Amino acid sequence: MKSHIESLLEQTIESFKQQGIVPADFQARIQVDRTKDKSHGDLATNLAMMLTKVAKKNPRELAQLIIDTLPASSYVAKVEIAGPGFINFFIDDNALANQLQQALTSDHLGVALPTKQTIVVDYSSPNLAKEMHVGHLRSTIIGDSVVRALEYLGHNVIRQNHVGDWGTQFGMLLALMEELRAANGEQAKMELSDLESFYRAAKVRFDESTEFATRARQLVVALQSGDEYCNKLWREFNDISLSHCHDVYKRLGVSLTRADVHGESAYNADLAQVVKDLDAQGLLSESNGAKVVFQEAFRNKEGEPLPVIIQKADGGYLYATSDLAAMRYRSNVLKADRAMYFVDLRQALHFQQVFSLAKLAKFVRPEMSLEHTGFGTMNGEDGRPFKTRSGGVVKLVDLLDEADVRALELVRSKNPDMDEATLTEIARVVGISSVKYADLSKNRTSDYIFSFEQMLSFEGNTAPYLLYAYTRVAGIFKRATDIDLSQAKIVLEHEKEKDLGTKLAQFGEVLTRMTDKGLPHVLCGYLYELASEFSSFYEACPVLAAETEAQKQSRLLLAQLTAKTLKTGLSLLGIETLERM
């Protein structure tokens, strides 16, 4: 409906141009919003006030002129002027009912698909050689939910897991392995737990020994230069680490696969060319032996230019170098129209600099959109970054294990007579869903407090509440197995039917808002509101005990569309639904 009203207003602006009311080259930014008070209609626009200056007319006069010029539409019951010049649209109940009826049989619940784009989404991207920790959670699940929604809207989405499989951490591992082999000539078979402790030991040596640190950096350069021995060990380290990552992805219900891994090492052969191309354009400068780029727009508090370091004095490359190579690949090879980077907000300056440099150096096509969709931190209940009691980093698998245990206790307390296998499966879904939803339901740009007690609550905007809401709606059809809805029609008579129908019709708008800015919390908020709206409808409007057969069938169709929308919305968040809880 919102897009339909926007289209009517766009046609009105074109008519104004032809009449000379606004200049022929005028570009209007049409904004249509949902009203908070239904007495003011369903949708409203401030277009008249926006046009006042250019049309040289007062807002209320312009508002009336807009109404008089609007093309006729069966979707609009009436249009009114409010206040200084707001235009309020009242949607026709029959038109809304028809839209909902069509949504029931549509492949995409009636959602209008946008122009198809090729969109690269860079997310998760953990540094390898160590286990995933809670700091990897946000990028992984926020990115995955946006990917799912983009694909649902028909876009060609290319997942890119830009893992940190190159760099100093591998130099440390190689240097320690070199020392151990020199000492005893043996190579222990590495399991993941060994790799984790191996990394910690290497880090201690790196921090304590200047000689070891120097050797580690030399081995990084050797690795980047294609040394066969270094590459063999590097592949072993990576294989162990990636196996762990994909075990975590599977447990989280994340759609990333091995085929999506395109880490820093994938661009190793291009790094020297990046340096050459920047040099050929006269963009490189030298600073303390390193090759850097200064851009006028980026300065520190003292007004001194901030460098983008492209190549270190020892010949090694940095994140900026591989990021530039990746951007060029994504633009020129993958032909991306848009690239979204789900990376911590603390990297904002880095991305501002490399995005600017990629455009300046013409590494990406001018029309390609580069977007840093950053996020805040997950904090403990003390408001500080989430840590173990001893102050260490919390492994992601440990967090998920605890979620399983707590969810099992919760589910068992509510279903004491349920068999253990069913309890365990329900608890698995509730536990993982609660961790994911608690994160996704927060604005990604904000920090948030991680609390098991809050996320496992059956009250408020939580996964258990929504999972239960879905089972409640789906449960209606377990009691209505003999009802034929093939000829049923949706009729909106009761106020609560209209409210539920209006909310159901907003699904497409919500997905557009979510994918435009990479904001899963918008979808979470909508699903919570939809579940709450259905609860109000269900209390006020008997479904199976409706007064007439036609009314019962209409309300069953509304329940059916609600169930489909909840299930689809939760699946786009990467959350499984349950048929019983």
From Swiss-Prot:
<dbReference type="InterPro" id="IPR001278">
    <property type="entry name" value="Arg-tRNA-ligase"/>
</dbReference>
<protein>
    <recommendedName>
        <fullName>Arginine--tRNA ligase</fullName>
        <ecNumber>6.1.1.19</ecNumber>
    </recommendedName>
</protein>
<dbReference type="Pfam" id="PF03485">
    <property type="entry name" value="Arg_tRNA_synt_N"/>
</dbReference>
<comment type="similarity">
    <text>Belongs to the class-I aminoacyl-tRNA synthetase family.</text>
</comment>
<feature type="short sequence motif" description="'HIGH' region">
    <location>
        <begin position="126"/>
        <end position="136"/>
    </location>
</feature>
<dbReference type="GO" id="GO:0004814">
    <property type="term" value="F:arginine-tRNA ligase activity"/>
</dbReference>
<dbReference type="InterPro" id="IPR005148">
    <property type="entry name" value="Arg-tRNA-synth_N"/>
</dbReference>
<comment type="subunit">
    <text>Monomer.</text>
</comment>
<keyword id="KW-0067">ATP-binding</keyword>
<dbReference type="Pfam" id="PF00750">
    <property type="entry name" value="tRNA-synt_1d"/>
</dbReference>
<dbReference type="InterPro" id="IPR014729">
    <property type="entry name" value="Rossmann-like_a/b/a_fold"/>
</dbReference>
<dbReference type="GO" id="GO:0005524">
    <property type="term" value="F:ATP binding"/>
</dbReference>
<dbReference type="GO" id="GO:0006420">
    <property type="term" value="P:arginyl-tRNA aminoacylation"/>
</dbReference>
<dbReference type="InterPro" id="IPR036695">
    <property type="entry name" value="Arg-tRNA-synth_N_sf"/>
</dbReference>
<keyword id="KW-0436">Ligase</keyword>
<keyword id="KW-0963">Cytoplasm</keyword>
<dbReference type="InterPro" id="IPR009080">
    <property type="entry name" value="tRNAsynth_Ia_anticodon-bd"/>
</dbReference>
<dbReference type="Pfam" id="PF05746">
    <property type="entry name" value="DALR_1"/>
</dbReference>
<keyword id="KW-0648">Protein biosynthesis</keyword>
<dbReference type="InterPro" id="IPR001412">
    <property type="entry name" value="aa-tRNA-synth_I_CS"/>
</dbReference>
<dbReference type="InterPro" id="IPR008909">
    <property type="entry name" value="DALR_anticod-bd"/>
</dbReference>
<dbReference type="GO" id="GO:0005737">
    <property type="term" value="C:cytoplasm"/>
</dbReference>
<keyword id="KW-0547">Nucleotide-binding</keyword>
<dbReference type="InterPro" id="IPR035684">
    <property type="entry name" value="ArgRS_core"/>
</dbReference>
<keyword id="KW-0030">Aminoacyl-tRNA synthetase</keyword>
